[in-house]
Amino acid sequence: MGIIVQKFGGTSVGSIERIQHVANRVIEEVQKGNDVVVVVSAMGKTTDELVNLAKQISNHPSKREMDMLLSTGEQVSIALLAMSLHEKGYKAVSLTGWQAGITTEEMHGNARIMNIDTTRIRRCLDEGAIVIVAGFQGVTETGEITTLGRGGSDTTAVALAAALKAEKCDIYTDVTGVFTTDPRYVKTARKIKEISYDEMLELANLGAGVLHPRAVEFAKNYEVPLEVRSSMENERGTMVKEEVSMEQHLIVRGIAFEDQVTRVTVVGIEKYLQSVATIFTALANRGINVDIIIQNATNSETASVSFSIRTEDLPETLQVLQALEGADVHYESGLAKVSIVGSGMISNPGVAARVFEVLADQGIEIKMVSISEIKISTVIDEKYMVSAVEELHEAFGLAEEAAAVRS
């Protein structure tokens, strides 16, 4: 057979009982004749607990020392999983990110993987061992330990699958797959059997938390087939791959949404490109992520620009904008972003009109809109967020089309 990479998140290894369950899932794959590489996150809330410990020492801890501290969380879970497999009669070896040959750039807290030397992993596999790798971490060329930021364990797993030329990468989570929308809010949400990399990447970027965007981007670039599955259920999950053979007739594949959005409008900025660039360069330098951007001319000499941000970034955004001479800044909080995604929109005109019609019928005002080939995002009042998602979910027939699949 081939190499299979499995990734288990913090919830999946959150207790000794769950680690024992994960060991059994790993053994099931080994018994199929596959070589197995397992990537695990820190147990449960371990990372949060480590962050809190650091805050008790310092309000502004060194990023280098934070990486040293946070990287210990995964070391606990990989060692315990290896011990569990030993007790069940299987040869297993745990490796930290740097022992596994994962080299990253020189950026503490949010490093990107630059290279993976798979020599040691392959040697362990050749010796008949199950290899368990700590997610979320690596080492620079100068020997400094780094962490990969949010979603880092997903990225570790996909990067290893690419480097090892694995048959596929299974991402085990606390949900059974990728749904048409969040089933906690929309009861008619259904699981999607297959979805393309591009569609999954859009959903991930829009806040669908099942997969991190960086991991999906890695999978797309290296054509790594992904399956999102539940660690607690034997139910088949959602395949993420290049070619989607089913449901091609579906115009919309999923709906993502997020609350705590604020619209910021800057009026009276000088009407030339450098002026606008100065605003967004300053925001980027402060680590503020700007989403939808709309620019309008107010007169022959000045213009206004509106953009959306996370509400938590508002205080820092206002600090940046206060430095602009002659500009008048307004903002509106209590907003939400609702987005529909689907490759079928490329060849089906009128999707945006249908979205506007559905929202208008519910008396929902659209405050901002952004449209791309496979995505339409709208910013609306937060109080209408769930009802808007429900109405769009029904209008595009998502509840009837994407049925769950059991193995």
Swiss-Prot record:
It catalyses: L-aspartate + ATP = 4-phospho-L-aspartate + ADP. GO terms for biological process: diaminopimelate biosynthetic process; homoserine biosynthetic process; lysine biosynthetic process via diaminopimelate; threonine biosynthetic process. This is Aspartokinase. InterPro entries: AceGlu_kinase-like_sf, ACT-like_dom_sf, ACT_Aspartokinase, ACT_dom, AKii-LysC-BS, Asp/Glu/Uridylate_kinase, Asp_kin_monofn, Asp_kinase. Its EC number is 2.7.2.4. Catalyzes the phosphorylation of the beta-carboxyl group of aspartic acid with ATP to yield 4-phospho-L-aspartate, which is involved in the branched biosynthetic pathway leading to the biosynthesis of amino acids threonine, isoleucine and methionine. CDD domains: AAK_AKii-LysC-BS, ACT_AK-LysC-DapG-like_2, ACT_AKii-LysC-BS-like_1. Substrate binds at residues 25-30, 47-49, 74, 125-126, 150-153, 289-291, 295, 351-352, 365-366, 372-373. Residues 264-338, 340-407 form the ACT domain. Pathway: Amino-acid biosynthesis; L-lysine biosynthesis via DAP pathway; (S)-tetrahydrodipicolinate from L-aspartate: step 1/4; Amino-acid biosynthesis; L-methionine biosynthesis via de novo pathway; L-homoserine from L-aspartate: step 1/3; Amino-acid biosynthesis; L-threonine biosynthesis; L-threonine from L-aspartate: step 1/5. GO terms for cellular component: cytosol. The keyword Kinase applies. ATP binds at K7, F8, G9, G10, S41, T173, D174, F179, T180, T181, D182, P183, R184. Lysine-sensitive. The record marks K7, E74 as: Contribution to the catalysis.
